[in-house]
Amino acid sequence: MEFRLVDLKTWKRKEYFTHYFESVPCTYSMTVKLDITTIKTGKAKLYPALLYAVSTVVNRHEEFRMTVDDEGQIGIFSEMMPCYTIFQKDTEMFSNIWTEYIGDYTEFCKQYEKDMQQYGENKGMMAKPNPPVNTFPVSMIPWTTFEGFNLNLQKGYGYLLPIFTFGRYYEENGKYWIPLSIQVHHAVCDGFHTCRFINELQDVIQSLQNHGGDEE
């Protein structure tokens, strides 16, 4: 994994970054419905399929891989991996597990299953310890669907990485849908970039229809 520093003097986005990071700090969230019919009617497991799809599109675009390091320098990770929530039924609290991103869907799912088997019973916020710096957060709230969702972060104006939150899927008119909230920083990500992400994410989900696995 490489962390490439951004040269602010020559960066084409310098004016926008300065405006939305310093002058008028601004984050925003967008909630959309994704068609997951191909996943639900196929044999793919839902959660790893969604994690793979989100990670694939995150790794396509630099604006979703930018952060500020410990020295206050802005840079871009060469690759990101998901750090996602799992629910602990006995404590009614969640834990986080991270899984290495692998471009091959089948291999990614195998790594997901391996992590779940090894760390899924661990308690605490980090069921799988020592998360790398190049992880991004994904949450699943499977108990209800929603049409709007946003996070209120006290220090969110300094956080550049995207945050993804899925809700409960539902069936409507013969199709399966799931809500997804995407929270981003306007300093690095405009509406165009978020909409492109959503459109590409839907395409990746559609492409998973021919992949097998145990249904979840």
Curated annotation (Swiss-Prot):
Residues annotated as catalytic: H186
Domain of life: Bacteria
Transmembrane feature ranges: none
Its EC number(s): 2.3.1.28
Record's keyword annotation contains DNA damage: no
GO MF: chloramphenicol O-acetyltransferase activity
SUPFAM superfamilies associated with the record: CoA-dependent acyltransferases
Keyword Cytoplasm: no
Enzyme kind, highest EC tier: transferase
GO biological process, one term: response to antibiotic
Coiled coil region boundaries: none
Protein keywords: Acyltransferase, Antibiotic resistance, Plasmid, Transferase
Signal peptide feature range: none
Stored InterPro entries: CAT-like_dom_sf, Chloramphenicol_AcTrfase_AS, Cmp_AcTrfase
Subunit structure comment from the entry: Homotrimer.
UniProt record similarity statement: Belongs to the chloramphenicol acetyltransferase family.
Function: This enzyme is an effector of chloramphenicol resistance in bacteria.
The protein, known as: Chloramphenicol acetyltransferase
Organism of this sequence: Vibrio anguillarum (Listonella anguillarum)
